[in-house]
Each structure stands twice: as structure tokens, then as C-alpha cells.
Amino acid sequence: MYLIPTVIEQTNRGERAYDIYSRLLKDRIVFLGSPIDDQVANSIVSQLLFLAAEDPDKDISLYINSPGGSITAGLAIYDTMQFIKPDVSTICIGMAASMGAFLLAAGAKGKRFALPNSEIMIHQPLGGAQGQATEIEIAAKRILFLRDKLNRILSENTGQPIEVIERDTDRDNFMTAQKAMEYGIIDRVLTRADEK
């Protein structure tokens, strides 16, 4: 069983205990450290909305260490990042793959970072279908539609031509932090927290 660490703070009113994620939220840090599904997306979206309502002019930092996951759940996070007023800075620690890389690139321009040993991976959507031929055809059309949508957005966020994105996402495409910076997924490789 995984235990969530607790942080104890001293205040003028005494001691206060927080789970680590609540304590990070006080500093406007949201942590995405798992595969992306609807439950994870709802948690991330609610944290972003809360922080935007609390102070619409102060940046939010989204730390990403995720292998990716559900496209629709990831797009819910993406749309919220674009919808709220505060800039969302993205920082890759460990791995940002698939939808994780998509969200990394979706951070505010100039505020997308990765740590030196991070790994970033982009690829086309994965999916499967079963059932009658008509159902399989519907599923195939949908995944092609989603692939085109994700490629277009990734092209806008990286500055890469759509043809390059289509070619580079055809198979799993792993990048170092440096390569991701050259590609336009991030703006800078960080070695220390005070460089942000």
C-alpha cells in the first residue's frame, strides 16, 4: 500500500498537518504523477479551477511524471489549462509520455520546462475496437479524428509543421529533455529550481 506523506507546519495557532499534495497546492503546485484517467483528470481540473479562483493573476505550476492515458481525460485537463486566466507552467520530472507529453507542451509559452534526465515521448493515439463491422468503422473514424486533432494542437504548441508532427508521431518517439527543447515541446531544461 502506498502512503501519502504528511507535512507538519508550525503556525501562530499551533501545529497543522497536511498531506503533501495539499501542502504543495498552497504553493500553487499541482502534481500529475500517474496514468491519466477520468478520476485523475477530475482531480487536476478541480485543483486548477480552485487555484484560478483563489488568485487569477498568479501562475500555477503543473509537475508531470506520467506515462499518459485517456485522450478525453487529458483533453479535459488541456482545455482547463487554456480556459483559466493564470498561466500554467509545466515541468517534466521523470517521464512525460503520450498525453503527458501533450500536456507538457500545452503549458504557457516560455514556461515549459523539463529536468535534465527527463524523458519525453510522443506518438499517435492507441485504441482498439470490437463488435460489428459498423461499430469498428465508427471507432476507427473516431481515433483518426482524435489523431488529427492532437497533431494539430501539438503542431500549434511546438511550432513544428503538421507534416513533421504526423511523421514523428507515427511510432513511439522518445526524446531527451534537450531534444524536447529543440523540438519545441519545452522552452528550457532546468537544473535548479531557482532557474524558473
Curated annotation (Swiss-Prot):
Source organism per UniProt: Geobacillus kaustophilus (strain HTA426)
Highest taxon listed in the record's lineage: Bacteria
Free-text function comment from the UniProt entry: Cleaves peptides in various proteins in a process that requires ATP hydrolysis. Has a chymotrypsin-like activity. Plays a major role in the degradation of misfolded proteins. ClpXP is involved in the complete degradation of the Site-2 clipped anti-sigma-W factor RsiW. This results in the release of SigW and the transcription activation of the genes under the control of the sigma-W factor.
CDD domains, A to Z: S14_ClpP_2
Protein name, entry field: ATP-dependent Clp protease proteolytic subunit
EC number, as in UniProt: 3.4.21.92
Oligomer and partners: Fourteen ClpP subunits assemble into 2 heptameric rings which stack back to back to give a disk-like structure with a central cavity, resembling the structure of eukaryotic proteasomes.
GO cellular component terms listed in the entry, alphabetical order: cytoplasm; endopeptidase Clp complex
HAMAP family: ClpP
GO function term, MF aspect, one: ATPase binding
Compartments (UniProt record): Cytoplasm
InterPro entries hit by this protein: ClpP, ClpP/crotonase-like_dom_sf, ClpP/TepA, ClpP_His_AS, ClpP_Ser_AS
Key words of the record: Cytoplasm, Hydrolase, Protease, Serine protease
Family membership noted in the UniProt record: Belongs to the peptidase S14 family.
Biological process (GO), any one: protein quality control for misfolded or incompletely synthesized proteins
PROSITE patterns assigned to the protein according to its UniProt record, in alphabetical order: CLP_PROTEASE_HIS (PS00382), CLP_PROTEASE_SER (PS00381)
